[in-house]
Amino acid sequence: MKIVFTGGGTGGHVIPNLAIIAAVKKLAGHAQIFYLGSQDGLERKLAEKTGIEFYAIQTGKLRRYFDWQNAVDALRVPVGIVQALHRLIKIKPQVVFSKGGFVSVPVALAAALLRIPLIIHESDLSPGLATRLTARFAKKICLSFPTTHPGHKIQITGNPVRPIGSAEHGREFLDFGNDLPIVLIAGGSTGAVFLNLLLERSVFALAHKTNVVWLTGAGKLPKMDLPENVRLFDYLDQEYLDVLAAADLVVSRAGANALFEIAAASRPSVLIPLPAESSRGDQVENAKFFEKAGATMVMPQEKAKPHDFAKLVIWLLSDSARLAKIGAAAKNLAPSDAAERIAKIILDAAK
């Protein structure tokens, strides 16, 4: 049995794929796994690191705004489709699984042209552009959030996440040497410019009362002297899961994968979603869903001033009962078997 995975651009599209691949291998150890993605994307690095056979194709980013690069990327998509067709014809997979992102579109369309069963997964509450372009060709559409538009293709699976880390290992890795609570601020695999600027202006106030773990995003480390109880990283791979488990509070954007990894670890959080005017509004919708369930606290970006932000974080960390309640509510939103559910759907489609 041969299965092709695709999806990339950010960790939110790649990391769930790795969780699903692990579940597929557990259920069907004989399955051959292949990954089609971009030449320079995070998906190549992570796929090859885990021993997955990877093939690069041309991809074009799907922007919703005017940019001269749109014309160049528009030419890359058909080239990517041809490359994906060539690769799929050679591999002859029984099924293709798409996790979304602009990287996935050429592969999903090539699968449709070759009549290979296509399974897709949408993490966000509202579907992204890649999902909207390819959903009509899918045999099954897996969703992380409940939907008000059920159909025969729809399967509510939850969001696949990596195994929960060890808080003990996380504390050993961070080596703070004190009993202060730990706050983890993470802007995702590519970083969040606003969160980094916010931390530059509030990290000293936070460090008086908390231990701070600051994930800036790859290549975005600030050039500044920091208190000794601040740990600065541009990116963490497997260590992130242990650090997440060790955190007393997490501050994050509201991308679905980040949200569900926080929830799976029962961590309370403060979400600062990417504003709707800077995106399609998916993070705002994700954050509102979690907030309505009592599973987070939301601080809109326009209200996230350094003093107010530090004050909120320190106040929350002083209320252990509130933190426990938020963490428990978050855990209820994250099915522990999402990766296995999706793996079974993929394997059924491959029969």
Regions from the PLM with identified roles:
Residues 41, 46, 50, 169, ...:
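Donor-nucleotide binding loops and adjacent catalytic segments primarily
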Residues 52, 116-117, 248-249, 266-274, ...:
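Structural loop-to-beta junction motif characteristic of Rossmann-like glycosyltransferase folds
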Residues 112-168:
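Active-site-proximal region of nucleotide-activated glycan assembly enzymes
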